[in-house]
A protein has these predicted regions:
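Structural motif
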Residues: 122-136, 143-148
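Ser/Thr-rich, Pro/Gly/Ala-heavy low-complexity intrinsically disordered linkers and tails
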Residues: 41-119
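Extracellular ligand-binding/catalytic regions of CAZymes and related secreted enzymes
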Residues: 335-364, 433-497
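A glycine-rich, often tryptophan-bearing local segment used as a flexible ligand/cofactor-contacting loop or short
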Residues: 298-405
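A short, solvent-exposed beta-strand micro-motif common in secreted/extracellular proteins
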Residues: 140-142, 173-178, 184-199
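Helical hinge/lid and interdomain linker segments adjacent to catalytic or ligand-binding clefts
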Residues: 234-344
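Short, acidic Ser/Thr/Gly-rich low-complexity loop/linker segments typical of extracellular
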Residues: 144-180
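Catalytic beta-strand/loop cores that center a nucleophilic Ser/Cys/Thr
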Residues: 357-466
């Protein structure tokens, strides 16, 4: 199939590929250099869903739902018991998921095997599993073929093409979408963001259909028989940076009235923070798509602030194989020592800053900014004396315990021998009031690429205490989690060095 050269951009890296304007790119393959790595193997605010009204013309394919059923004890997971779900996952040649960032073009089907005239339009809003937080940049498409799920372990998420005749679109910053489609039975609605994937069997009537939020919501649990997949996540069960609460408020667990995770309901793995022994078993690490090492998790480990050589090598191998690695403030050694060339911390021999400082920063990533601006008022300001988002791009981050002096370009060669910068991308910047130059604007939340994986770091804690609703820095964390899960538009280059 012929097409015009298109530019595909992922953060600061721009790739060139020949892509017809109706091709869609979704992940599948594993880079050859990954083989050895794989073998070695720190609430809900009461808002109600604001999704579109349900059309009474939508029909579902007769069938039954199998697998675990929704339960009020595990929190809202966006599950609709009236919609039958499921995906044929046995055919590796069917449309795959996920796309990077690219322009999907118009509904023209030139060079696509003949004209297809849409006679139906599906509209709706994609929400987080909590049914109220909109999801920006989610892929929505309709297919009659099988859908390949994400592997149940770490993998290299390289994009592949989705057939140009497949109706597809991305959600807007407010999570909404409008998808022209062809009416008929036995179709699948696919909604995907990173490793969050939902497949819903439905019959599409002619005309306009507003899909209910319970149909268009990302799943909150791993339940393949019900057409639901989520990233496998491991998070250290520590305090005060309670990332577990943020994940629960996203919809991956039940929360109490104070916005705290009700332990036992989580759809992720809690790792005891008594030691770093989990990081000494690469095979165990490779079971997870994302690993969180929050602030206080490492602070009292016997070897702190050093990272033992075997543990350091495991972190590098895990990320190179496609893992997503996240650390915050006091756990900075788990970014600095495995990836020393990517950033320079303030006072590098003692990067843990006291006293902690608040920072009046700025959101510098345009897509993150657009999403925050599109949030409804009750999500921009949760009250209780917490910072709000009413002065964007300004954002106040609380309890920063480190400072980054610089982030550096990291130049590697792609598969064509061309230079590619895989260094950190800044999302939020601001001054460090406890640093020697308190007026200097510094990166405060960053993500970088290392082989097939990505690492992210923030100088601030994300969830220091139990509280209802999602604070600005918790929202930034969730957006970054979703964005680092998307696939690579080109085969990722090997790690630097």
């Amino acid at each position: 199939m012929q097409g015009n050269p298109s530019l595909l951009a992922v953060h600061r890296t721009v790739y060139r590929a020949r892509v017809h304007r109706h091709d869609r790119r979704l992940p599948t393959r594993i880079a050859p250099w990954l083989t050895l790595a794989l073998i070695a193997g720190c609430g809900d605010d009461g808002a109600q869903p604001t999704g579109p009204a349900t059309s009474d013309t939508l029909t579902t394919v007769p069938g039954t739902m199998s697998g675990p059923q929704p339960s009020s004890s595990t929190g809202a997971t966006g599950d609709d018991p009236h919609v039958t779900t499921g995906a044929n996952t046995t055919n590796p040649d069917g449309p795959k998921f996920d796309v990077g960032k690219m322009d999907l073009g118009s509904s023209d089907t030139e060079d696509c095997g003949g004209p297809v005239s849409p006679d139906a339009t599906l509209t709706g809003t994609v929400y987080a599993p909590n049914l109220y937080l909109p999801i920006s940049g989610a892929l929505v498409y309709v297919t009659t073929g099988p859908v390949e799920p994400p592997p149940d372990a770490v993998y290299c998420a390289e994009c592949v093409e989705l057939d140009c005749s497949t109706p597809s679109t991305f959600t807007r910053p407010d999570g909404s979408f409008s998808l022209p489609a062809v009416s008929g039975p036995n179709q699948k609605l696919v909604i995907q963001k990173g490793q969050f994937l939902r497949v819903v069997d439905l019959a599409i009537p002619a005309g306009d259909t507003a899909l209910p939020a319970t149909t268009t919501t990302l799943p909150g649990r791993w339940d393949p028989p019900a057409g639901m997949w989520i990233p496998r996540i491991a998070v250290y069960n520590t305090s005060p940076d309670k990332v577990k609460n943020v994940l629960a408020k996203f919809g991956m667990g039940a929360i109490n009235d104070n916005g705290a995770l009700i332990e036992g309901t989580e759809n992720f793995t809690l790792i005891p923070d008594l030691s770093g022994s989990f990081l000494e078993n690469l095979a165990e690490m490779n079971k997870y798509h994302i690993i969180f090492v929050p602030c206080a998790a490492t602070k009292y480990w016997p070897e702190a602030p050093d990272v033992p050589p075997a543990r350091l090598a495991n972190v590098q191998a895990y990320v190179a194989a496609g893992g997503k690695w996240y650390a915050t403030d006091h756990s900075n050694e788990y970014i600095e020592q495995p990836f020393p060339d990517y950033q320079e911390f303030h006072s590098p021999f003692m990067p843990d800053i006291q006293p902690a400082y608040d920072s009046n920063g700025t959101v510098v990533d345009p897509d993150l900014l657009a999403w925050l601006q599109a949030l409804p008022p009750n999500l921009k300001d949760i009250g209780g004396g917490y910072p709000n988002l009413n002065a964007l791009p300004g954002i106040t981050t609380r309890l920063n315990y480190s400072g980054i002096d610089t982030i550096s370009p990291i130049i590697v060669q792609d598969m064509e021998g061309k230079d590619v910068d895989v260094g950190h991308h800044p999302w939020v910047e601001g001054p460090c009031g406890s640093c020697s130059d308190p007026q200097m604007i510094r990166p405060m939340a960053v993500t970088g690429q290392y082989g097939c994986g990505r690492m992210m770091y923030s100088t601030f804690e994300n969830s220091s205490d139990n509280h209802p609703g999602l604070s600005p820095q918790e929202l930034v964390l969730l957006y970054m989690i979703l964005e680092i899960g998307v696939c690579f538009d080109e085969k990722p280059p090997p790690p630097p060095g």
